[in-house]
Amino acid sequence: MGRSHQKSEKCYCAQAHHNNWLGGIVTMAQAHDIVRTWISEVLRSHPGPMAIAMRQRAKFEGWLKFSLATHAELKGATDIVVEAPISVSGVNRARSDFSFKWDGVRYDVELKTPNTNWRMPGVAELHRPVTKNFSSIVEDGRKANSQDCQPLVAFVIFPIPIGDNRWLQYLERIGHELQLTLSREAHATQITLPISPAHSVDVVICCFPISLRVAEQLVPIAV
C-alpha cells in the first residue's frame, strides 16, 4: 500500500507540472522538472534496453536523445530537432543534443549518461572514468551560452546500488563548478529499474537550467 501511494503521489506531481505546462505558463523550473519526468518515463518504459545498459555499464546517450525527442513530441512539444545548433544568430556554433519548443519558447537540452564504478550484484565489474564523466557535464553547462534558447542540462547517473546516496557528491561538485545551487529535492529523481529476474539497480535523473547570466560568466562569447 505504501508503494502504491508513493507512485500515485509521484504521478500526481508529474501530471500537475504537465497541466501547468499545458496552460502555457512555463518557468525554467517547470521546464527542467518536466524534462526530468520525461526521462524517467522513457527509462521505465524501455526495460529491455535499460537492463542491458545497466548490466554492462554501457552509456546510452545516442539512444536516449532520440527516445526523449520522440517522447517530447508525443507530450505535445513542437519543433523537435536532434543535434540542434544552439545559436540561431550564429554567435555560438555549438549544438545541443536536442531542442524543442513550447508556447513559442525554445529549450535546448544537453544529455549525458555518466556511468559509475560502484559494485553491485548483477552488474559487470568494469572500470569507468568517473571523474571525466562528470567533468563533461560541467563542460556542457559551460557551452550553453546563447541568447536564442533556454538551455537545460540533463544527465542519468547509473548504475547505483539501491538506496545509495553517494551520487550526491557529484551533484554538489557540478553545482560548485557551475556556480549553481543544486539539490536532490529540486533537481534529481532516483528510481529503481530491474536488470534481471533476480536483480535491480537505481538510476538518478538530474536536470537543471543554465541561466544566461551564469553562462555569460562561465563562457566568453566568441567573436
Name each region found by the language model.
Residues 2-3, 7, 11-74:
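Interdomain/boundary linker segments immediately adjacent to catalytic/signaling cores
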Residues 27-35, 130-145, 211, 215, ...:
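Ampiphathic alpha-helical segments that act as solvent-exposed interaction surfaces
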Residues 39-46, 68, 72, 76, ...:
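Hydrophobic, Leu/Ile/Phe/Ala-enriched alpha-helical segments that form helix-helix packing faces
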Residues 61, 83, 110:
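Acidic-residue sensor for enzyme active/binding pockets
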Residues 73-101:
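A short acidic/basic microdomain associated with nuclease active sites
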Residues 96-111, 116-117:
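Active-site beta-strand-loop-beta-strand hairpin of nuclease catalytic cores
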Residues 111-170:
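Catalytic cores of nucleic-acid endonucleases
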Residues 164-223:
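Non-catalytic C-terminal interaction segments of nucleic acid-processing enzymes
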